[in-house]
């Protein structure tokens, strides 16, 4: 890992909580397969790039939760004159991203405790990552801390309503938690209002993918590393009878294009006062 000990790195390290280690391990395992099935992630990230303020030209940008580095490379192309940092909690993703380039440095780090100096960057870009953070106020406080005056936090995330079809179908089968939980959009509004950052954009929209069958959907979730990571999930394999019941329940949602999977995506662009 590059030595960034000069004015960039903060004096503290990163202390990942146990649940974060589980998330990191899951995404590390998915690194090799991620890009092949990341249609939603690419589309959402492109929309987030388009939401950046017109004429904005950061001298130093951070791709927070960089994953395979797809948007690190996009940011490097867009802001060629700036320095780029790619940050992720999953070492497997960082290894994959580092091999493909794009950023000047690749750093293991946690969005709730960024390994960056105060006032050290102009843009924090984070697409579909902070939904895995338990402490959203800490994420926003860290963004405010590390941004320079006039700097921007641009993020996309997921909120309640995501994978509702799958959640409702599992409810027909049993009482276990089978689908990742996400915070309500009202929480984003509340915490952004108290963050000390000025919201330029804060909205949500539904994006719907279609799959020929349930197996295709669950395969994609696993390939993305985004399968069920919640406490309360069932241990061990799911029996054939329950799977058949799940398939039957999900078929109620079938549309002409296939089985829908709805992602309720939050877009936020927040600026630090100059």
UniProtKB/Swiss-Prot annotation:
Q: Can you state which reaction this protein catalyses? A: malonyl-[ACP] + S-adenosyl-L-methionine = malonyl-[ACP] methyl ester + S-adenosyl-L-homocysteine
Enzyme Commission number(s): 2.1.1.197
Q: Which GO terms describe its biological process?
A: biotin biosynthetic process; methylation
Top-level enzyme category: transferase
Instruction: Give start-end ranges for the coiled-coil region(s).
Output: none
Q: Which UniProt keywords apply?
A: Biotin biosynthesis, Methyltransferase, S-adenosyl-L-methionine, Transferase
- Superkingdom is Bacteria
User: Pathway involvement?
Assistant: Cofactor biosynthesis; biotin biosynthesis
* Molecular functions per Gene Ontology: carboxyl-O-methyltransferase activity; malonyl-CoA methyltransferase activity; S-adenosylmethionine-dependent methyltransferase activity
Family of this protein? Belongs to the methyltransferase superfamily.
Q: What function does the entry list?
A: Converts the free carboxyl group of a malonyl-thioester to its methyl ester by transfer of a methyl group from S-adenosyl-L-methionine (SAM). It allows to synthesize pimeloyl-ACP via the fatty acid synthetic pathway.
- Protein name (Swiss-Prot/TrEMBL): Malonyl-[acyl-carrier protein] O-methyltransferase
Organism expressing this protein natively:
Pseudomonas paraeruginosa (strain DSM 24068 / PA7)
**Gene (name only):** bioC
């Amino acid at each position: 890992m590059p030595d960034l000990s000069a004015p960039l790195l903060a004096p503290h390290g990163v202390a990942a909580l146990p649940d974060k280690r589980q998330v990191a391990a899951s995404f590390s395992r998915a690194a090799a397969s991620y890009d092949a099935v990341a249609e939603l992630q690419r589309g959402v990230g492109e929309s987030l790039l388009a939401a950046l303020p017109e004429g904005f030209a950061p001298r130093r940008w951070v791709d927070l939760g960089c994953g395979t580095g797809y948007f690190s490379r996009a940011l490097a192309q867009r802001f060629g004159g700036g320095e780029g940092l790619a940050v992720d909690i999953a070492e497997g993703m960082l290894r994959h991203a580092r091999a493909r380039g794009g950023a000047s440095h690749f750093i293991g780090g946690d969005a709730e405790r960024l390994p960056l100096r105060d006032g050290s960057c102009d843009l924090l870009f984070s697409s579909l990552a902070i939904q895995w953070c338990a402490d959203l106020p800490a994420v926003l406080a860290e963004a405010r801390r590390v941004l320079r005056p006039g700097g921007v936090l641009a993020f996309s995330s997921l909120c309640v309503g995501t994978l509702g079809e799958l959640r409702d179908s599992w409810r027909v089968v049993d009482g276990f938690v089978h689908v990742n939980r996400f915070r309500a959009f009202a929480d984003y509004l509340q915490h952004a209002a108290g963050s000390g950052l000025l919201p330029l954009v804060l909205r949500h929209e539904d994006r719907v993918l279609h799959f020929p069958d349930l197996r295709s959907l669950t395969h994609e979730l696993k390939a993305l590393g985004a399968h069920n990571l919640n406490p309360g999930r069932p241990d061990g394999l799911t029996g054939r009878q329950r799977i058949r019941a799940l398939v039957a329940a999900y078929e109620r949602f079938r549309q002409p294009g296939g089985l829908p999977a709805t992602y309720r995506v939050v877009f936020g662009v927040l600026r630090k006062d100059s």
